[in-house]
Amino acid sequence: MTAARGVDAIIHAAALVSLWQPSPAIFDEINIGGLESALDVARTSGIRRVVYTSSFLALPPAGATTALRANDYQRTKVRAREVAQAAAARGEPVVILVPGVLYGPGPPNEANLVGRLIDDHRRGHLPGIVGSDRCWSYAHVDDVADAHVAAIVRPLAATEYVLGGENAPQMRIFEIWRDLTGTPLPRRIPFAAASAMGWLEECRATMTRRPPIITRGAVKIFRHDWTLNSSRSVEELSYRIRPLESGVKTLFSTR
């Protein structure tokens, strides 16, 4: 409560982004419980606005009407979005932002999937790409950050805004990287082989408590297209959709 004293708005962007954890409950504690705690603070502190950062994985895949729950990260992000929507429906000052695949300068970790894949490929540690022809929506982190600021300061007509980017096949990232660096394209891994690898990696992780390289849940996600429409955000938040090629060049300048 002390931290919220004199605060006008809260951005709740914290999340556990991970393929796997030894205890699935940690996803619930952070991804759902963290949001519930932020909402509790807002209710008791007179916060004017709460901006909650969701994920494109909390939305249904392209062409579907139901969200997936392929792994514990996705399951808890779907549930957290429902919690935020319920709060907004009760009249609480909640705005939900739904970024696409975030990329840009930063450490190559699980929250920066594009940076991690490129870094692994550059160092020869990437076995290949699963679902290379599936289209995802790539949102540059700087543009998403600007949208968060706009969501705090602007009067808004809606309670949820999608922050997608250029919709492109996964392999397009590596084609741009090849053109910049001369690095060959990665191999394409069939879904069946990736699922088998995921099962083996899950078994290894259970025995060693070390994170798997891939999981069957991740393969389920990679089977789908995740294209996004950000027109409302462009109009009401002045959201910028950066061309993927110019965005990937910002990665090149930091590697």
PLM ranges: what are they?
Residues M1-G33, V41, P61-G63:
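NAD(P)H-binding glycine-rich loop region in Rossmannoid oxidoreductase-like domains
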Residues L19, S55-G63, L102-G106, A111:
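Conserved catalytic-site region of short-chain dehydrogenase/reductase
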Residues I26-I32, R69-R81, A111-G115, R134-Y138:
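Short-chain dehydrogenase/reductase
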Residues G33-T76, V95:
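Conserved Rossmann-fold NAD(P)-dependent oxidoreductase catalytic core, especially the SDR/UDP-sugar
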Residues E82-P105:
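Conserved beta-loop-beta element that borders a ligand/cofactor-binding pocket
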Residues G104, V130-R134, Y161-A168, R178-T181, ...:
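Glycine-rich Rossmann NAD(P)(H)-binding loop
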Residues L117-A139, D143:
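A conserved pocket-lining segment of Rossmann-fold NAD(P)-dependent short-chain dehydrogenase/reductase
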Residues A147-I213, S230, P243-F252:
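Mid/C-terminal beta-alpha module of Rossmann-like enzyme folds, strongest
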